[in-house]
C-alpha cells in the first residue's frame, strides 16, 4: 500500500432510536380521537334540548364530561406505559438484552485486547469517541509505554500490521535497522513509528491520543500484576525513585506510580506535526542527559505493503523482513505443499532466556479492519538505564542483521470474493521461534471448516502462557461482529462496544 494514502474513514452506523416512531403514531391517534370528540360536544350544545337550566342538557353535559375524563385517562395510561417500555426509552440505543445479547468478547462495533486493563479501557474510549482501530491501537500503545515499562515504552522497537477493510489493502509498519545511541543503549524509535502510522491511517487528532497517557504519567497509575512481578524479579537497581518506595523496596501490586518527566515528553510530542519531530521530543532531552550528540543518521520507521500468501481458504498477510514474517510464509508454503493441514496440538508458546521481552495488542472492528502491534525493549526494563529528564527506559537491543524473530503478526482473510468474509488476526508476545509457533496455530485454524459457534455465555478461549510473555492474542471478525477469540489465561483484558 502506498505510504501516501490519506486517512481512513469508516462509515458510522446510524443508531436506531426506539420510541420515535411509536410516539409519532400515538400523536396521530390522539388527533383522530380528539377530533370526533369535539364535534360530538358541539352537536350536544346546539341541540334544542340542551338549554340552560334544562334537565336533558345537564345530563348531556355530565355524560360528555365523563366521556372526556375516560378518554384522557386512557391516553395518559398509554403514554406512561410507552415511556416505561424498552421501545419508548430514547436514552437507550441498544436493543433489549432479551432480543439481542452476546457472549463475553463479542461486540457490535469494535474490540481491543491489550496486556493492561487501563490501556484496553483507553482504547475503548477512543473507539466510542469516533476513532478507528488505528487510533485505539496507537493510543493503547502509548498507554502501555507508561504503565508497562518492563515490556515496552517510547524506547521500544515497534512492528505493526494493519488491514483496511475499505480498500482491502494490508500495510506493515516496519522498524528500521537497530541503531545504538551508546554501547548497550538502543536508539528510541517508538514515537516516530506510532506517529507515522497514525498520520496515514488515524482519524482522531494526534494530540487527543496522548492526552490520557500523559495524564496517567503525571497523576499516577496503579501498579498491576505484570509490572509488580517484573519489579519483584528485577529489583530496584537503576529504577528508583520512580518504581521504589521511600525505603528502597520495589513498588508492589496496587501501589501508585508517577512519571512526571515522561508526561512532559508526551505533551511535547503531542505538538509534533511529523514523525521526525515526534521522535525529537524524546531524543533531544535524551542526548543531553547522556552528554552525547544527535546521531547524524537515524533509523526511519516505514510503511510498506504487507507480505501476502494465497491459501486455499483465502489470503494471508504478515510483516516483511527483517521480521519473522518471511520465515512464516516459507514454513506455511512448505507445510501446505507437503501434507494436508491437521488439527494436531501445537507446542506451548515457550519463553527462553534468549527470548526478547515484548508487548502485543490487537484492535478490530466489525467491518473487518484490524491492527496488530508488537514492540520490544529486548530485556525486562530494557537496558535498565532510566533517563532522568525523560523518565524513559532505553532498550538494549543490539545492532544485528539477524531478523526480529519475536515479530510475527498475521492476518487471514478467509475468502477473497466475499465482501463480508471472516477475518482472523493473531499476534504473540515473548515467544521463542515465533514463526514456528504461529504456523502451527494457523494450520489448525485452516483445518477447521468454519469458526465454531461458541455457547451464548462462554468466554473467549483462554490459552496457557505467562501474562504478557508467551501470550497469543486472537481476534476475529465474523457475521459483522468483532470477536475476541483467544486470550492468555488470567490476563490481557479486552474491551469493546
From Swiss-Prot:
Assembly and interaction partners: Heterodimer composed of the light and heavy chains. The active site is located in the light chain.
Key words, A-Z: Acyltransferase, Glutathione biosynthesis, Glycoprotein, Hydrolase, Membrane, Signal-anchor, Transferase, Transmembrane, Transmembrane helix, Zymogen
Annotated transmembrane regions: 52-72
Ranges annotated as biased composition (Acidic residues): 20-34
Cited function: Hydrolyzes and transfers gamma-glutamyl moieties from glutathione and other gamma-glutamyl compounds to acceptors.
Sites where a glycan is attached: 164, 169, 367, 378
Compartment(s) where it occurs, according to its Swiss-Prot or TrEMBL record: Membrane
Any GO BP annotation: glutathione biosynthetic process
Family classification: Belongs to the gamma-glutamyltransferase family.
Species assigned in the record: Mus musculus
Protein name per UniProt: Glutathione hydrolase 6
Lineage of origin: Eukaryota, Metazoa, Chordata, Craniata, Vertebrata
Pathway of action: Sulfur metabolism; glutathione metabolism
Description of post-translational modifications: Cleaved by autocatalysis into a large and a small subunit and the autocatalytic cleavage is essential to the functional activation of the enzyme.
Stretches of the chain found on the membrane's Cytoplasmic side: 1-51
